[in-house]
């Protein structure tokens, strides 16, 4: 897999590989809500993106990078 290259995704599907702890938490949430695992992930991801629309604020990242001294 090459890093640093981006291209437009051909569709709107995503493959996730979860660690066992995260998977177990997701399964427990699915069981509590009565939704499918896919719908649970969709709702949680959508909620996160609505709550944190600019998680990586580009101006803050730039300021942090400028404040680092060369070693």
From Swiss-Prot:
Main localization (coarse): cytoplasm
Entry GO terms, CC: cytoplasm
Coiled-coil ranges per UniProt: none
Any GO MF annotation of the entry: DNA binding
Localization, UniProt: Cytoplasm
Task of the protein: Conjugative DNA transfer (CDT) is the unidirectional transfer of ssDNA plasmid from a donor to a recipient cell. It is the central mechanism by which antibiotic resistance and virulence factors are propagated in bacterial populations. Part of the relaxosome, which facilitates a site- and strand-specific cut in the origin of transfer by TraI, at the nic site. Relaxosome formation requires binding of IHF and TraY to the oriT region, which then facilitates binding of TraI. Also positively regulates tra gene expression.
Protein name: Relaxosome protein TraY
Native organism: Escherichia coli
Higher taxonomy: Bacteria, Pseudomonadati, Pseudomonadota, Gammaproteobacteria, Enterobacterales
Gene: traY
